[in-house]
Amino acid sequence: MHVLIHSPNGYPFTLRSLVKNDSGILGEFFESLSPQTRSKFGPHPLDREYAKYVICKNIDVDNVSRFIIVTETQVVGYFIVDFNEYPNEGSRYSSYGIELDFALDPVFAPCIHDNYQGQGLASLGLDALLRYFDKSKIRSLVLMGGTQEPNLLARNLYKKFGFVEIGEFYTDYNRLNNVDMRLVR
Ligand SMILES: CC(C)(COP(=O)(O)OP(=O)(O)OC[C@H]1O[C@@H](n2cnc3c(N)ncnc32)[C@H](O)[C@@H]1OP(=O)(O)O)[C@@H](O)C(=O)NCCC(=O)NCCS
C-alpha cells in the first residue's frame, strides 16, 4: 500500500508498507523513541540491529504486516499487524468468552514519533489502514498486550475508531492495569 496523507497542519506524509530497504530509517526511528514512549510501546527490541537483522530480513516470511508513515527523510509512525499466534491474548480473550483466530484477528500495535504525537497522525494512518483492510479477510484488530489504563491518548484514539474495551488485566512488571480493546469490522 502507498497512500498520501495530509496532517491537520497541512504537512504531507506517506503511509506505506515497510520494505527491506527501510532498515536504516526504521532503526533510526526506533532509536529516537523516548523512554516515555518505550514504556508504552515495547512489542520487540527497538534498535537498529533488530530493524535490520530481524524485521527487514524476515519481511516476507514472518507473517506480520508492517506499515510506516514517512516524511521525505524519516519514519514518523509505525504500525504492526501481526497474524501470528499470541497465546496470552488468546487465553485472555478466551476468558472473556471470545475465541480469537489470529489469521482473522491479528494483533495491532501503533507508535508515533515523540515529536509528532497528538497531532492526528495515528488517526490519519489508522483511517487509511482500515480502508485498505476492507479488501482483506481481517475480521478484527486486537490490541497487542492491551493498552495501559493511564494511556488516554491511545485509548481515545482506539475509541474514536470503534475499538471496544473488552476487559482489564494487571501486569506486575509495570504495576499497571491494562485494557484489552478490540475493533470488530
Ligand atoms: C498512542 C499513539 C499511537 C496515538 O497516536 P497520535 O498520532 O498521537 O494520536 P492522534 O493525534 O491521532 O490522537 C488520537 C485521539 O487521541 C485524543 N488525544 C489527542 N491528544 C490527546 C492528549 N494529549 N490526551 C488525551 N487524548 C488525546 C483525541 O481524541 C484524538 O483524536 P481527535 O483529535 O480526533 O479528537 C501515539 O501517541 C504514540 O505512539 N504514543 C506512544 C506509544 C503508544 O502509546 N503506543 C500505543 C500503545 S497501546
Q: What do the PLM-derived regions correspond to, one by one?
A:
Residues Y116-A128:
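Conserved acetyl-CoA pyrophosphate-binding loop and the N-cap/start of the following alpha-helix
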Residues I68, Y96-F102, V107-G118, G146-Q148:
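A short, internal acetyl-CoA/4′-phosphopantetheine-binding micro-motif in the GNAT/acyltransferase core
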Residues S34-C56:
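Conserved GNAT-fold acetyl-CoA-binding loop/helix
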Residues S123, K135-S136, Q148-G167:
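Conserved active-site alpha-helix within GNAT-family acetyltransferase domains
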Residues Q117, V142-R155, T171-L176:
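Conserved beta-strand-loop-alpha-helix junction that forms the acyl-donor binding cleft
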Residues P12-E28:
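A short beta-loop-alpha structural element at the N-terminal edge
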